[in-house]
């Protein structure tokens, strides 16, 4: 539930939907041109999922995380956020939208079995 609530709180605080909020701050910096986010009947983005990216855009996101929040030489997200969001927060090995795996790996799962897996130690 809290993962869904975070998206709604960002929308209410910013006054715009998650895509509009994140496009200038993140998506455009990564070259993600037209992200879409699924919404509920009230127009709230489901912050814990429902983000539609192409496979190449999902790959960019994985590279961005592998580079600890840096893209094209610029720090876009703090290294601390990357570390926090990719560590296992509960018993099922799930962090902030990332699943923890063996060998210090983590992954973001997309619809229809699309996966962006990051193995920082390899």
For each feature predicted by the language model, list its residue ranges.
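A structural signal for well-ordered alpha-helical scaffolds and beta->alpha junctions
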Residues: 2-3, 19, 55-58, 78, ...
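Active-site-proximal alpha-helical segments within enzyme catalytic domains
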Residues: 5-9, 47-70, 115-122
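A generic secondary-structure signal for well-formed alpha-helical elements
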Residues: 13-14, 30, 65, 69, ...
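Active-site Gly/Thr loop motif
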Residues: 33-34, 79-122
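A conserved catalytic-loop motif detector
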Residues: 57, 63, 71-87
């Amino acid at each position: 539930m809290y993962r869904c609530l975070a998206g709604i709180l960002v929308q209410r605080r910013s006054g715009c939907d998650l895509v509009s909020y994140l496009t200038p701050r993140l998506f455009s910096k990564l070259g993600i041109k037209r992200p879409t986010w699924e919404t509920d009947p009230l127009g709230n983005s489901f912050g814990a999922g429902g983000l539609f990216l192409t496979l190449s855009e999902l790959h960019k996101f994985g590279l961005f995380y592998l580079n600890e929040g840096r893209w094209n030489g610029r720090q876009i997200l703090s290294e601390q956020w990357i570390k926090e969001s990719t560590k296992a927060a509960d018993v099922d090995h799930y962090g902030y939208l990332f699943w923890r795996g063996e060998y210090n790996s983590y992954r973001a799962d997309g619809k229809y079995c699309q996966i962006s897996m990051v193995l920082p130690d390899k």
